[in-house]
């Protein structure tokens, strides 16, 4: 793919804007409103489901282990079956990868000493060698040298995704060097600088032109940025930044939830690390909000069945991904992007804890009935059963969200590990989170 066709998710969104499975939707809506918060590991599922999720996690880990440079920085993308020559890494993919290394060590996917040394090397490079501005990193870098790629931005969201992985590693590994480096990397970030005098955070900064005009001022994947900033012991954000961003709502066939006109991943990313189950702030229970968003997205896909006959109870899910024409932000409701019948596996994979039986059925259907959609690193980024198009690539962030949410569904491991960080707890406390009482 031409490098010029590679865009960030948020750039595309800015451009666009400038057993419940068998129930009728009316009953799905009622079910979503009444759903009880339970630990994912307590949700009953079969041994075959567990085996598939383990395979999903192992293959994703293979990507993060194999497709990383000597610096530990994970590639933005690679060919589905390896033997890839891309050298561009994404700091967001590295954040998912660091969390994946914690899963791999806990599950014995590789020897502990090998994994510990990989984590050490990754953090050393982040602290000593990777260019930064006030602690924030460039979105895309060369995986071997750390050099900025494509004149990309210093990214507040991608730095936050990286930091979530850094803090997960600090909590999981008892190695003193890992803990020290992780603390320093997080502590160096100057969160108020990214406010640039405003009430909400900028999406990024360019050395050539300064801060981006676009701001994190409306609900999306932004919660992790503000919570990390609020919890910072060195350069904290003021508490009022949590209430400064808007929380618009969508009402789809009677089910209302907080969302912008954004793809499904915006309801997933912060929740891969921050555990919102059974908690709420002054506005919402955001875990339940993501349950509703997933229920509605499934029904939205089913409503397109006449246009795209392959969409069914067993096969649905669209979120930002590659398409046959290049990377695109698409989904709904409301309808976003030039939908063409493609299926994006990480849409279901990233929502496993929110709508487990339905999402698991999608992954099983793809694995069993679309063999070209599976390879060395797991599921392709996207495919189109209507046209027969299969993406030759996988994306690190899409493998990453599926891996982390699969593990959260199985054991809650990433939630339980990350939330032991006192900074994560402090951030949620400053934002006003408290237990949700029935």
Task: Identify the meaning behind each predicted range.
Residues 1-2, 75:
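Intrinsic-disorder/low-complexity regions
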Residues 2-6, 11-32:
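N-terminal export signals
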């Amino acid at each position: 793919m031409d490098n010029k066709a590679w865009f960030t998710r948020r750039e595309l969104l800015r451009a666009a804007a400038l057993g419940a499975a068998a129930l009728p939707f009316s009953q799905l809506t009622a079910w979503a409103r009444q759903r009880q918060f339970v630990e994912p590991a307590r949700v009953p599922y079969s041994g075959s489901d567990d085996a598939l999720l383990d395979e999903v996690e192992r293959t994703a880990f293979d990507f993060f282990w194999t497709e990383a440079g000597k610096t530990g920085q994970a590639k933005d993308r690679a060919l589905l079956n390896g033997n890839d020559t891309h050298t561009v890494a994404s700091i967001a993919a590295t954040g998912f990868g660091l969390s994946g290394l914690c899963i791999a060590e806990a599950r014995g996917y590789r020897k502990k000493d090998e994994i510990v040394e990989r984590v050490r090397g990754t953090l050393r490079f982040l602290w000593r060698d990777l260019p930064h501005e006030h602690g924030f990193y460039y979105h895309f870098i060369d995986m071997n040298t750390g050099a900025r790629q494509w004149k990309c931005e210093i990214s507040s969201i991608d730095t936050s995704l990286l930091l979530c992985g850094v803090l997960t590693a600090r909590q999981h590994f008892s190695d003193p060097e890992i803990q020290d480096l992780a603390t320093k990397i997080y502590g160096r970030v100057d969160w108020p600088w990214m406010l640039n005098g405003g009430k909400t955070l900028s999406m990024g900064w360019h050395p050539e032109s300064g801060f981006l005009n676009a701001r994190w001022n409306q609900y999306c994947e932004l919660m992790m940025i503000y919570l990390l900033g609020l919890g910072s012991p060195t350069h904290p954000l003021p508490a009022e930044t949590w209430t400064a961003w808007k929380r618009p709502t969508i009402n789809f066939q009677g089910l209302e939830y907080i969302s912008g006109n954004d793809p499904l991943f915006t309801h997933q990313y912060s929740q891969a690390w921050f555990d919102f189950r059974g908690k709420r702030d002054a506005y919402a229970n955001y875990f339940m909000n993501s349950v509703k968003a997933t229920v509605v997205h499934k029904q939205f896909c089913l409503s397109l069945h006449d246009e795209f006959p392959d969409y069914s109870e067993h096969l649905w899910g669209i979120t930002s991904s590659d398409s046959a024409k290049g990377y695109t932000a698409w989904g709904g409701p409301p309808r976003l992007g030039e939908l063409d019948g493609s299926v994006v596996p990480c849409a279901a994979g990233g929502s496993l804890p929110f709508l487990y039986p339905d999402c698991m059925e999608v992954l099983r259907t793809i694995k069993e009935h679309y063999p070209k959609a599976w390879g060395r690193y797991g599921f392709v980024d996207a495919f189109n059963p209507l046209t027969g198009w299969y993406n030759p690539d996988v994306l690190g962030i899409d493998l990453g969200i599926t891996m982390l949410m699969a593990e959260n569904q199985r054991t809650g491991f990433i939630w339980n590990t990350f939330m032991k960080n006192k900074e994560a707890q402090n951030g949620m406390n400053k934002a006003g989170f408290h237990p949700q009482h029935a």
